[in-house]
């Protein structure tokens, strides 16, 4: 495990338990709040243009094919500071971070275009805009998490010690965790008052309400074991069926970094092997400039190798698999050398 990933893993564990004292920075560059605010504004403008394009063409691919074909939606992400030739495409958006999101009629056209762009001078990478899905164990829809109990993490006693040490919750710093998922049920009694403003990248608005349930479940799991100083930043990237696209997810990951999240949770995945350069880029930049830690699911494909899933296979992410009540690997969880840690699931 490289030094940066080791630091990220240690920091993620610390953030899970709401550390009292500030964590020492391992950032590589200085970025001001004004820099982040301007970049965030440009990001949302780009997200709006992307939304208009994806909404128009989203019905032209079959979501059922998404878990086997990275090019299922006929769309690619190209990184280049140069102008590109969009011949053969039906739509495109650009103008942020040198990203060009290009739409084609079929998955095969998109695949061939990506291969061709890889040969173009000045292109850093060309890869599919992968369709992603929520990672969930069927039938699990509760907020009280057994993994925080006395036989496991023992969060209650830890939090009692934390409160005693700090002299009250009012002395703890606010810790923001971005949940990049299906949204947030702001009316749920367990979640009321435990969030900061987020964004809906699916509908392109500032109201990330959950119309699926998975995101609220993940948020509830995080809040279960933490004191009230921990708040959720809900970033909706998956629709009512639990599907989304890499382009919006990458933008949400950067948005979390730019807007003060200490950590981000992504319980979602898609097929990608090594087509993950955009994820690698945004994770590295977020860690270097804003000290954010990205915790990602290994995936729930019943023992598959997590290295074939995005963003689980991004080296600088903390990749989390699941174990059961007997502290054995959960049968639904993905496995492999890319996994950094397991958690109750």
Regions found by a protein language model. Name each.
Residues 77, 125-127, 176-179, 220, ...:
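Structural recognition of the beta-strand scaffold that forms the well-ordered cores
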Residues 26-140:
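Primarily auto-inhibitory N-terminal propeptides
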Residues 213, 225, 235-316, 326-331, ...:
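Substrate-binding/access-modulating region of protease and related hydrolase catalytic domains
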Residues 119-122, 190, 291, 316-319:
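Glycine-centered tight turns that cap/initiate beta-strands
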Residues 139-233, 244, 248-252, 258-263, ...:
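Active-site core segment of subtilase-fold serine proteases
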Residues 4-16:
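Sec-dependent N-terminal signal peptides
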Residues 189-191, 210, 235, 322-345:
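Catalytic-core environment of secreted peptidases
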């Amino acid at each position: 495990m490289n030094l940066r990933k080791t630091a990220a893993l240690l920091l993620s564990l610390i953030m899970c338990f709401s550390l009292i004292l500030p964590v020492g920075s391992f950032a590589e560059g200085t970025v001001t709040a004004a820099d982040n605010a301007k970049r965030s504004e440009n990001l949302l403008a780009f997200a709006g243009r992307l939304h208009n394009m994806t909404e128009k063409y989203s019905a032209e691919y079959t979501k059922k094919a998404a878990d086997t074909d990275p090019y299922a939606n006929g769309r690619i992400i190209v990184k280049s500071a140069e102008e590109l030739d969009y011949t053969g495409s039906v739509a495109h958006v650009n103008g942020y971070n040198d990203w060009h999101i290009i739409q084609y009629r079929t998955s095969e056209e998109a695949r061939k275009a990506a291969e061709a762009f890889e040969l173009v001078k000045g292109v850093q990478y060309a890869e599919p805009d992968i369709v992603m899905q929520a990672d969930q164990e069927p039938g699990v829809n509760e907020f009280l998490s057994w993994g925080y109990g006395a036989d496991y993490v023992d969060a209650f006693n830890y939090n009692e010690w934390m409160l005693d040490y700090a002299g009250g919750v009012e002395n703890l710093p606010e810790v923001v965790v971005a949940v990049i998922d299906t949204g947030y049920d702001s009316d749920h009694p367990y979640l009321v008052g435990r969030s900061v403003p987020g964004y809906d990248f699916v509908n392109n608005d500032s109201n990330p309400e959950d119309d699926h349930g998975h995101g609220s479940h993940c948020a509830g799991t995080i809040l279960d074991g933490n004191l009230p100083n921990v708040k959720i930043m809900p970033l909706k990237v998956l629709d009512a069926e639990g599907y989304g696209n890499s382009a919006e997810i990458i933008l949400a990951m950067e948005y979390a970094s730019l807007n003060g999240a200490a950590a981000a949770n992504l319980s979602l995945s898609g097929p990608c092997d090594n087509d993950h350069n955009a994820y690698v880029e945004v994770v590295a930049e977020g860690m270097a400039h804003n000290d954010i830690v990205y915790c990602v699911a290994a995936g729930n494909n019943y023992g598959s190798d997590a290295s074939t899933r995005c963003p689980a296979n991004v080296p600088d992410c903390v990749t989390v698999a699941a174990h059961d009540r007997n502290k054995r690997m959960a049968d639904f969880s993905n496995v492999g050398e890319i996994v950094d840690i397991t958690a109750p699931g």
